[in-house]
């Protein structure tokens, strides 16, 4: 079953560094590079969602990240995403911090965590339902 991995960092630049490492290793893991997102909690209290779009990416990934950002930042929004997970991620987004988000299907969470272990961080995981992941992976097998 697909899942969403969130790794929280106390510094605002670390999640982007970990995302770059996952992007670099994406072919060997294997991980869809569009399945990586970062939320940065700016020091002024605003939040920013960072994603990268690779050649051949579908609009489904843009939609997915928009939904994830929306439900994490607005706990009252209905979602398949576990409320406790959403509250925990939002609670870890203190000014000057960041969270790496990775949607996985074929890759295990352990593989992702091992790839970015040098950055530390607090990991959380949450299963992703079919409604949330529709159209993300072209191959139904993953």
Model features per residue range: what roles?
Residues 1-99, 103-142:
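Positively charged, small/polar-rich N-terminal and surface patches that mediate targeting and assembly
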């Amino acid at each position: 079953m697909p899942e969403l991995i969130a790794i929280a960092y106390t510094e605002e630049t670390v999640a982007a560094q970990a995302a770059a490492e996952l992007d670099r290793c994406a072919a060997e893991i294997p991980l869809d590079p569009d399945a990586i997102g970062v939320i940065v909690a700016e020091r002024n209290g605003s939040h920013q969602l960072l994603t990268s779009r690779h050649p051949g990416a579908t609009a489904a990934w843009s939609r997915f990240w928009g939904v994830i950002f929306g439900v994490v930042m607005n706990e009252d929004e209905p979602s398949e995403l576990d409320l406790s997970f959403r509250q925990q991620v939002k609670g870890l987004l203190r000014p000057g911090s960041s969270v790496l988000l990775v949607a996985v299907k074929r890759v295990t969470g352990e593989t992702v965590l091992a790839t970015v272990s040098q950055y530390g961080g607090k990991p959380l995981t949450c299963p992703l339902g079919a409604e949330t992941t529709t159209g993300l992976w072209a191959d139904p097998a993953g």
